[in-house]
């Protein structure tokens, strides 16, 4: 799970992580720093790894957590490259809230059904996605969610893609 160094959306990290752990999956938390990351509502997380050190051998699913801080990855060639490599290597690639903008800017949503927090709709459309506005969308190993209320369903859809 990739979180922003600050202002990630707490429940979009905590709820999927809880679902993944409850279902026997290991969770690695990555960020752009190894210093403590603080969510919008005060959740403190010390990342396990700098996202720049991640390789697709480290995970089966890549999850970009939303919240305003996720914008630090919007134009990150490293984040885009990681997402593209994960997809090419058959991994599940996912993002929630505003974070699907990262996948769009990486070119992964071209011709795909996707959703996003309403502020990101235009970015998805510019990237060639078919924006649905649904809480969660799945299209060919790419899972997108539109915000915190969808966090648990989003996690379940990510896990379904792992089967």
Each PLM stretch: what is its role?
Residues 1-89, 93, 102-108, 121-163:
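Extended, subdomain-level signal for the structured scaffold at the beginning of enzyme domains
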Residues 111:
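Exposed beta-strand and adjacent loop surfaces of beta-rich binding modules
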Residues 97:
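Catalytic nucleophile serine of serine hydrolases
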